[in-house]
């Protein structure tokens, strides 16, 4: 009877194995009277229990608690057997927990080691060493705490140390670790760039990717230059020198690298006649309101000279200004030219210059 | 076997170094740093930022261009010329 109770407990202990349970029940009903057979049965069941606990251990789940199993054993003798069996259960459970904890601690110690190395390596990287110190403090605690906190610590460590963890067979000296960290960072940036550059994810290999990135940056630079050129061209008179400047620069670029700029050569060739067209227009359209500041300045300079001889040096000094690279020439020229004018006009002019500069940049 | 692999590796390493210096020359603010080769990580980070800034610039410039086109008087001779430029 007592052994029967023990069998009952073990039956409830692995309640999810239904077929095994029914089999055990049938066997128990048969052999209940025979003590020896019962003992044999008990040993059999104990074996089964070990198997079940092994199953639990390998699955990583918590085995059902033993006190729940006592519900099924109604007999008084069952209580005794239960008490007799209880240490076994407790030992088995504690064994499995111990095993798991030992496993966790091994996992913790493995990342801990490279972390110490990284702390030794990265004196210039305190952001890496600081979480390491924090984790080391936490590593000490789970030795006497249940397995749940140990699992949370490992989860946190997994995210922290993925970069510096040394796998089996990898070197753990400081130089190798530093190199590994560096390579990790580089590949991370490369991945980021891959997202940024279209069509880069088709290319495999670092060299191809770098090639693609370089091409993309060059095309973007060209695009920016072309767009600013278009804007400069659509605001014709003021930015005439800048168009010329861009034009000259791109021509020199094209001369240096003729194959690289086939796309730029075409619009430039078509820009040229229009620019040339502009110069007669400049003289024709002096009265047009839609023309830019520069023309108005020249016009107003001619129409309302504060000092009589002003118009002649104006015409003379604007011409070289057009050829001067950048806005500095304009600035000097305008200050020299319009020193006799009122201040607001000059501020408009300088605003315009700033605008040009921005566009050119 | 190992020697062949190492020689191939060194070639690709050279290639990559070349490409990286080329990329460095493309970046605007890395030019002044000159010969002192910055770390690849920093270079790649700068490249990311530079590409982003170029994107922004392109967007800004196209916005301005469309604004200019919208505010332009359509039958003035200046607009004619601009349109002929833009069509190219």
Swiss-Prot record, chain A:
Pfam families (UniProt xref): HLH
Polar residues bias (residue ranges): 146-157
Entry keyword annotation includes Mitochondrion: no
Motif (Nuclear localization signal): 166-173
Tissue: Expressed in panicles, leaves, leaves sheaths, lamina joints, stems and roots.
Disordered: annotated segments: 66-160
Keywords: Gibberellin signaling pathway, Nucleus, Transcription, Transcription regulation
InterPro entries, A to Z: bHLH_dom, bHLH_ZIP_TF, HLH_DNA-bd_sf
Gene Ontology process terms (BP): gibberellic acid mediated signaling pathway; positive regulation of gibberellin biosynthetic process; regulation of DNA-templated transcription; regulation of unidimensional cell growth
Compositional bias annotation for Basic and acidic residues: 124-138
Any GO molecular function: protein dimerization activity
Chain positions covered by the region annotation Helix-loop-helix motif: 184-220
Applications (biotechnology): Plants expressing BCL2 in the lamina joint and the spikelet under the control of BUL1 promoter exhibit increased leaf angle and grain length.
Location of this chain's protein in the cell: Nucleus
Location, primary (coarse class): nucleus
Keyword Nucleus: yes
Positions of the bHLH domain: 170-220
PANTHER family reported for this sequence: BASIC HELIX-LOOP-HELIX PROTEIN 79 (PTHR12565:SF319), STEROL REGULATORY ELEMENT-BINDING PROTEIN (PTHR12565)
Role description: Together with BCL1, positive regulator of cell elongation at least partially through increased gibberellic acid (GA) biosynthesis.
Protein name (record): Basic helix-loop-helix protein 79
Curated annotation (Swiss-Prot), chain B:
Principal location: nucleus
UniProt-listed Gene3D superfamilies: Helix-loop-helix DNA-binding domain
Domain bHLH, first and last residues per copy: 1-54
Biological process annotations from GO: brassinosteroid mediated signaling pathway; positive regulation of unidimensional cell growth; regulation of brassinosteroid mediated signaling pathway; regulation of DNA-templated transcription; regulation of leaf development; regulation of seed growth; response to absence of light; response to brassinosteroid
Function according to Swiss-Prot or TrEMBL: Atypical and probable non DNA-binding bHLH transcription factor that acts as a positive regulator of grain size. Involved in the brassinosteroid (BR) signaling pathway. Binds the transcription repressor APG and forms a heterodimer of antagonistic basic helix-loop-helix transcription factors that regulates grain length and weight by controlling cell elongation in lemma and palea. Contributes, together with LO9-177 and BC1, to the promotion of leaf inclination and grain size by modulating cell elongation.
Family recorded in the similarity comment: Belongs to the bHLH protein family.
Assembly with partners or alone: Homodimer. Interacts with APG. Component of a nuclear cell elongation controlling complex made of ILI5/BUL1, LO9-177 and BC1. Binds directly to LO9-177, and interacts with BC1 only in the presence of LO9-177.
Protein name as it appears in the record: Transcription factor ILI5
Gene name of the encoded protein: ILI5
């Amino acid at each position: 009877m007592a052994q029967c109770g023990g069998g009952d407990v073990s039956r409830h202990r692995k309640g999810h194995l239904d077929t095994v349970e029914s089999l055990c029940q049938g066997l128990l009903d048969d052999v209940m009277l025979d003590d020896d057979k019962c003992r044999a049965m008990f040993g059999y069941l104990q074996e089964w229990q070990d198997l079940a606990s092994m199953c639990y251990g390998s699955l990583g789940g918590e085995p059902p608690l033993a006190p729940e199993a006592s519900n099924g054993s109604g007999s008084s003798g069952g209580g005794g057997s239960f008490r007799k069996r209880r240490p076994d259960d407790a030992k088995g459970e504690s064994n499995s927990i111990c095993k798991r904890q030992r496993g966790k601690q091994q996992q913790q110690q493995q990342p801990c080691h490279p972390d110490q190395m990284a702390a030794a390596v990265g004196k210039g990287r305190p952001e890496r060493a600081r979480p390491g110190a924090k984790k080391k403090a936490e590593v000490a605690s789970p030795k006497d705490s249940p397995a749940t906190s140990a699992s949370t610590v490992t989860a946190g460590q997994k995210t922290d140390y993925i970069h510096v963890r040394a796998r089996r067979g990898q070197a753990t000296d400081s130089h190798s670790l530093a190199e590994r960290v560096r390579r990790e960072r580089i590949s991370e940036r490369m991945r980021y760039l891959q997202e940024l550059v279209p069509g880069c994810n088709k290319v495999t290999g670092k060299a191809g990717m770098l090639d693609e990135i370089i091409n993309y940056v060059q095309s973007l630079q060209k695009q920016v230059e072309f767009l600013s050129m278009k804007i400069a061209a659509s605001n014709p008179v003021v930015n005439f020198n800048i168009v010329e400047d861009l034009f000259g620069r791109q021509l020199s670029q094209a001369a240096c690298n003729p194959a690289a700029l086939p796309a730029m050569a075409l619009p430039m060739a078509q820009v040229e006649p229009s620019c040339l067209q502009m110069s007669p227009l400049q003289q024709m359209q002096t009265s047009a309101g839609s023309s830019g500041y520069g023309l108005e300045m020249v016009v107003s300079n001619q129409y309302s000279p504060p000092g009589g001889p002003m118009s002649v040096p104006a015409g003379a000094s604007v011409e070289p200004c057009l050829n001067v690279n950048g806005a500095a020439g304009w600035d000097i020229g305008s200050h020299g030219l319009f020193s006799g004018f009122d201040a607001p006009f000059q501020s408009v002019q300088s605003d315009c210059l700033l605008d040009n500069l921005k566009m050119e940049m | 076997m190992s020697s062949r692999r190492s020689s191939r590796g060194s070639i690709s390493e050279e290639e990559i170094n070349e490409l990286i210096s080329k990329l460095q020359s493309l970046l605007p603010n890395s030019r002044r740093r000159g010969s002192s080769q910055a770390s690849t990580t920093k270079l790649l980070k700068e490249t990311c930022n530079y590409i982003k800034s170029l994107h922004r610039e392109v967007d800004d410039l196209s916005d301005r261009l469309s604004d200019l086109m919208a505010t332009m008087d359509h039958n003035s001779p200046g607009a004619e010329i601009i349109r002929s430029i833009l069509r190219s």
